[in-house]
Amino acid sequence: MTRRRRRSSARSNPSAWKADGLMASILLVSGPNLNLLGEREPEIYGRDTLDELVGDARAVAEANGHSLDHVQSNHEGEIVDAVQEARDRCAAIVINPGAFTHYSYALADALAAFEGPKIELHLSNPSAREAWRRTSVVAPVVTGTVAGFGRHGYRLALEAAVTLLKEDG
């Protein structure tokens, strides 16, 4: 029999972070092919590298008293693991699921199990692209979506997460 570890209330309840003097950690997840940003289809995704976008996100988090953890993977299971592990250590998740947006029910289930704010992020606007990109299996389980703002989306998504954490705290 597998026994689930009980979660600490300070870690699972974003409002308890401030009361316990803990700096909230925000998880930024980058899905498949995002490691190629700056090289792959720059006319759609821009010329900024993933490192530059993560730097922008980290600056927003730190300016608001939070830390930022970043995970990038081209493998669905690794991303699901990162989201599950965030349940014990992060107050919010910002995720650019890439192509997993459209078919990863495993990722959607992992996100649904996370109690804090969850922001779906896309550099381009999937609704303005090919028909197969217009479906998000992640959207029903996240707090909100930031899409189509290019590099500004990373800052906007982090600002949304920070704002939601402040409202919960």
Language-model features, listed with the residues they occupy:
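Short beta->alpha junction loops
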Residues: 67-77
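Short, acidic/small-residue loops that bind anionic groups at enzyme active sites
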Residues: 112-129
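Short acidic/histidine-rich motifs immediately flanking catalytic phosphotransfer sites
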Residues: 86-93
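Short, glycine-/small-residue-rich phosphate/pyrophosphate-handling segment
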Residues: 128-169
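Extreme N-terminal starter segment of soluble prokaryotic enzymes
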Residues: 23-26
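Short Gly/Thr/Asp-enriched flexible loops that form oxyanion-binding sites at enzyme active sites
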Residues: 85, 104-116
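Glycine- and acidic-residue-enriched helix-capping/strand-helix junction motifs
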Residues: 37-51
